[in-house]
């Protein structure tokens, strides 16, 4: 009887160990799949636009608030970092800067992480004109494609843009893409601030 109890206990321990090992392997596989789907480590996410009823999870892009003077960004056509933060202090109450894009100006972000399942791009904007968004997809050997992210009319004070996502899907972004760059341009005069990306355009 005691021998049978010990045998049953041993079998139970082996079964629990097997389940734990399988779970660990599944976790490793899930982590590998996530790494494969996302073009890099996007970092911590938050519901940055929750004050506007948007509960999606976004990560803050590299100098997306332009507090470091646009470090890593490339500006042309008069685009530049100026004093004056977006009025909702979305990223932080200590922020003091934003990006001005005059008519014909462009601003190109550093390489950014993204997800292949409909990445969403959102920011704050103000001014008078049209804000245009393009996405440059990069592979290991350079640019693979330039995609149209859409445009939005900007008229007045600071407000969140729509989520730019409709043409950025796994069908549009080329296989082998490792990172993206966001290219902002305008007709008129537009200010932008606090650029965020939702890697998976979570619902």
Mark where each language-model region is.
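Bacterial N-terminal signal peptides that target proteins for export
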Residues: 1-9
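C-terminal segment of classical bacterial N-terminal signal peptides
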Residues: 16-25
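Extracellular glycan-recognition surfaces and repeat-rich motifs
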Residues: 28-38, 50, 59-97
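Extracellular carbohydrate recognition and processing domains
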Residues: 52, 140-176, 185-191
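Beta-strand acidic-aromatic groove motif in beta-rich domains, primarily in extracellular
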Residues: 75-77, 119-122, 129-138
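Short beta-strands within extracellular/lumenal beta-sheet-rich domains
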Residues: 93-120, 130
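Exposed low-complexity, polar/acidic, P/S/T/G-rich flexible segments that act as propeptides
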Residues: 187-203
